Amino acid sequence: MMLPNIQCKKNMLKYVNCGIVFQEIPDEVTLSINISNCPCHCPGCHSSYLWEDTGEVLDEKEISRFVGEYGSNISCICLMGGDAAPQEVNGLAAFIRKAYPAMKVGWYSGRTILSSQIDLENFNYVKVGPYIKHLGSLKEKTTNQKLYKVLDDKSLEDITSRFWKK
């Protein structure tokens, strides 16, 4: 008996929009890429339009197009979301690190812990934590969210307080 040739379709990242921002990663001019199909569905989310599986494919070719368009104006690329496909997020981060070694890479995850499919070697910054309205965003001292800088030894330095007004 011959079995049918079944190919598994990998999760494909899609993005809805992107833009240059100055507040997502301290001391960086960041191209923030908003990834759709967010599984977190945080109550009070300011980006609920990212819950649906919509947008354009986000792959190595699209990252290269972004770098060609914005490269001299940015120092960091931050993938905003992608919790439904952390392996693909990790793959894009690895690509950015290899193809554009001077470019910093960040990831904003809505999960409380990093996926085991994430290799910190591929990131300079990672944010973890769902948005919980009564605790506030990163700029609030009461937030549950944390932004970490990945150090050379792959340990994490909590830099969340950099968002707080003195």
Go through each PLM region and give its residues.
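N-terminal [4Fe-4S]-dependent radical SAM core
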Residues: 2-34, 39, 47-52, 166
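Short, conserved beta-strand edge motifs with alternating hydrophobic and charged residues
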Residues: 34, 76-81, 106-108
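Short, basic/glycine-rich phosphate-binding loops at helix/coil junctions
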Residues: 42-50, 71-75
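Flexible loop residues that form catalytic
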Residues: 50, 82, 130-131
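Canonical radical SAM enzyme core domain
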Residues: 52-64, 84-121, 125
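Flavin-dependent oxidoreductase catalytic cores
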Residues: 76-78, 89, 95, 151
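Classical nucleotidyltransferase
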Residues: 120-166
